[in-house]
UniProtKB/Swiss-Prot annotation:
Name this protein carries in UniProt: Argininosuccinate lyase
Native organism: Archaeoglobus fulgidus (strain ATCC 49558 / DSM 4304 / JCM 9628 / NBRC 100126 / VC-16)
Gene encoding the protein: argH
Keyword Ligase: no
Enzyme class: lyase
Record EC number: 4.3.2.1
Pathway: Amino-acid biosynthesis; L-arginine biosynthesis; L-arginine from L-ornithine and carbamoyl phosphate: step 3/3
Length: 483
């Protein structure tokens, strides 16, 4: 449709296949309809379309919308397809692209897709946080904590679950921060140098639910940092999920800390006894996939000159897949975590394994016997080297003497330092493992969750208010085009 006046020959069929984005454009089909409606209303406001012309074009857009996206459209992309289909319905469709380029059109569609899916991801993360908080409230029992995947110090499962929570909490914050930067309108920037038509860009932005415009016309069409940032948000969230998924795999096997729900497990095609953590493994794998998308997007974007380049088209499928796939993954994770059964009889039994109370024993020597910490560390290290997981006072005194330190440690002090429950409860500092401190953190995070849900509703409401304005303006012309 666009080539006929400039090109003498049609595009090579294989080149056309390479250049076509129609396969992926279904992701922005409805957004493009909305962008077209907003642009038509802006043209009418500027006096470039009569009321009747605007009505006919919007009616045609409604018909195209109701007919749905077609992958067999013989067009290069969805933008050309919609314009061509509208023009078949009304000759006024030829005026729809006045004062506009596909450059600002596609950038607007992408921002609308990204903002909606960032909010979807943020909501899924909030649901996951809710699940983790509820699990933590009921899981104050002991478990071993790890460094280097080796038994390190005892902790509470509730404390461990809050670590998951706080990691994902930052992913929520990143999604909201990215949304605020994404939710700006490029519409009206045209190819890159703006347009000679007097078009109200702020009005167009409001119609589409944006909270402002990307002011500089060249920056508006030349920049895809919002695509990279959105994919990064997804990639970082998937990294968080992958770390938890890895522990689910580990804890459901030889550790025996958890029992996986049947709904999130599979069996073997040959070994009937198997109950495999396939879904957790797939969550783990998808982190690599989304991180790969991020790398691909950055490598496509790097060193592209200003302003628009067709290279950008190859970033779009990476954006679509990353946000949609991550949203699904977080939803699956939340559902799985909600149904996982923890086995406290096993976690509590293993909480003291690997001389997990060694640090407490060293701290006891410092606080009660005035031994410098580094020397206390050496004394307890000597006990560990002798594989004494439950040393007596005599063992401690002998190890100290070997290192040239004369102390007379009492049995009751050693026994208290080796008491796993007391060790965990003794850590009541800010962020620590004592039950009271964990309960305080749970209460604070429940309050934060409530505030975040309110914020999310507010942001969604602001977008909907803008789109309601668009729908109302279309209704004034006699067209109900709610998307």
């Amino acid at each position: 449709m666009l080539r006929e006046s400039r090109m003498k020959k049609g595009m090579d069929p294989k080149a056309l296949k390479l250049s076509s984005s129609i396969e992926h454009d279904k992701n922005i089909f409805l957004y493009d309809i909305l962008v077209d409606v907003a642009h038509v209303l802006t043209l009418k406001k500027g006096g470039y379309l009569s009321e009747e012309e605007a009505k006919e074009i919007i009616l045609a857009l409604k018909k195209v919308k109701d007919s749905g996206f077609r992958e067999d459209w013989p067009y290069e992309d969805v933008h050309e397809a919609i314009e061509a289909e509208v023009t078949k319905i009304t000759p006024h469709g030829a005026k729809m692209h006045t004062g506009r380029s596909r450059n600002d059109e596609v950038a607007t569609c992408l921002r609308m897709f990204a903002r909606d899916h960032l909010l979807n991801l943020a909501e899924a993360i909030l649901n996951a946080l809710d699940v983790l908080i509820k699990k933590a409230e009921k899981s104050h029992f002991l478990m071993p904590g790890f460094t280097h995947l080796q038994y390190a110090q005892p902790t509470r499962l509730s404390h461990h679950l809050l670590a998951y929570h706080d990691m994902l909490s930052r992913d929520f914050e990143r999604a909201i921060e990215a949304f605020r930067r994404v939710n700006k309108s490029p519409l009206g920037s045209a190819a890159f140098a703006s347009t000679g038509y007097s078009l109200d860009r702020v009005y167009a932005a409001r119609l589409l639910g944006f909270d402002g415009v990307v002011e500089h016309s060249e920056d508006a069409v030349a920049s895809r940092d919002f695509v990279i940032e959105s994919i990064f948000v997804a990639a970082e969230a998937m990294l968080s999920i992958s770390r938890i998924a890895e522990e689910i795999v580990l804890f459901s096997s030889e550790f025996g800390f958890i029992t996986l729900p049947d709904e999130f497990s599979s069996t073997s095609s040959i070994m009937p006894q198997k109950k495999n953590p396939d879904i957790a493994e797939l969550l783990r794998a998808n982190a690599g996939k989304i991180a790969g998308n991020l790398t691909s997007a950055m490598m496509i974007y790097k060193a592209t000159p200003f302003s628009y380049n067709r290279d950008f088209q190859e970033m779009n499928p990476l954006l679509y897949e990353s946000l949609k796939r991550t949203h699904l993954a977080v939803e699956v994770f939340a559902s799985m975590m909600g149904k996982i059964k923890f086995n406290p009889e096993i976690t509590e039994r293993k909480a003291s394994k690997g001389f997990a109370t060694a640090t407490e024993l060293a701290d006891m020597l410092v606080m009660k016997y005035g031994v410098p910490f580094r020397m206390a560390h050496r004394i307890v290290g000597r006990l560990a080297a002798k594989e004494l997981e439950r040393p007596t006072a005599s063992d401690v005194n002998s190890a100290a003497k070997e290192l040239g330190v004369e102390i007379n440690v009492r049995d009751e002090d050693v026994l208290e330092a080796l008491d796993v429950e007391k060790v965990v409860e003794n850590r009541g500092n800010l962020g620590g493992t004592s039950k009271a401190e964990v309960e305080r953190m749970i209460k604070a995070r429940k309050s934060d969750l409530k505030d975040r849900k309110t914020l999310l509703r507010k942001l969604r409401g602001e977008v909907k208010m803008g789109l309601k304005m668009l729908y109302d303006e279309a209704k004034k012309l006699g067209v109900d085009i709610n998307v």
